[in-house]
């Protein structure tokens, strides 16, 4: 005997009841074990959606709609602060002579991705740096220029 010859023991299985196949079948005819009338006696009467309120006007249709959500269209930036650039200079990870680009920041782990990097002005910068990024806050722009560095906005 092998797996291809296995079958259930005699009498171990039964065929399912066939509903709605006439009075003589014992499970058919008038209402086919569904009771009388009502939603659950109709065909296609499965579970209703969780927001279904029994025919009452649903909540999302009753409350007023107003406002606007710009989330699908907003521009998300990976951010880096000026103090982080200064710390990298202090730790001699960055070189003052090399330009700081989004790719350099991504390689150093300052930002996760080199796409859309914005430099913010938290902290202080004491060394002149050539910084290239997709956007700068006004305070970051001022601090980089005060330290003798340059700011370049790169395109996508």
Swiss-Prot record:
PROSITE patterns to which the protein is assigned, alphabetical = RIBOSOMAL_L15 (PS00475)
UniProt subunit comment: Part of the 50S ribosomal subunit.
**Matches recorded under NCBIfam families:** rplO_bact
Does the keyword field hold rRNA-binding? yes
For this chain, the family text in UniProt reads: Belongs to the universal ribosomal protein uL15 family.
Protein name per Swiss-Prot or TrEMBL: Large ribosomal subunit protein uL15
Molecular functions per Gene Ontology: rRNA binding; structural constituent of ribosome
Stored InterPro entries: Ribosomal_uL15, Ribosomal_uL15/eL18, Ribosomal_uL15/eL18_sf, Ribosomal_uL15_bac-type, Ribosomal_uL15_CS
Task: Name the coiled-coil region(s).
Answer: none
Keywords of this entry:
Ribonucleoprotein, Ribosomal protein, RNA-binding, rRNA-binding
Q: What does this protein do?
A: Binds to the 23S rRNA.
């Amino acid at each position: 005997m092998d797996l291809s010859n296995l079958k259930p023991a005699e009498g171990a299985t039964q065929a399912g009841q066939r509903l709605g196949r006439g009075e003589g079948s014992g499970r058919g005819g008038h209402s086919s074990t569904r009771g009388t009338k009502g939603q659950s006696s109709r065909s296609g009467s499965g579970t209703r959606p969780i927001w279904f309120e029994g025919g009452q006007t649903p909540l999302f249709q009753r409350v007023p709609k107003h406002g606007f959500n710009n989330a699908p269209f907003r521009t998300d930036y990976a951010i880096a602060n000026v103090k982080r650039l200064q710390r990298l200079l202090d730790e001699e990870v960055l070189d003052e002579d090399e330009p700081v680009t989004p790719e350099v920041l991504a390689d150093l782990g300052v930002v996760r991705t080199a796409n859309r990097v914005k430099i913010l002005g938290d902290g202080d910068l004491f060394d002149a740096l050539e910084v290239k990024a997709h956007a700068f806050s006004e305070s970051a722009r001022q601090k980089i220029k005060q330290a003798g560095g340059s700011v370049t906005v790169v395109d996508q």
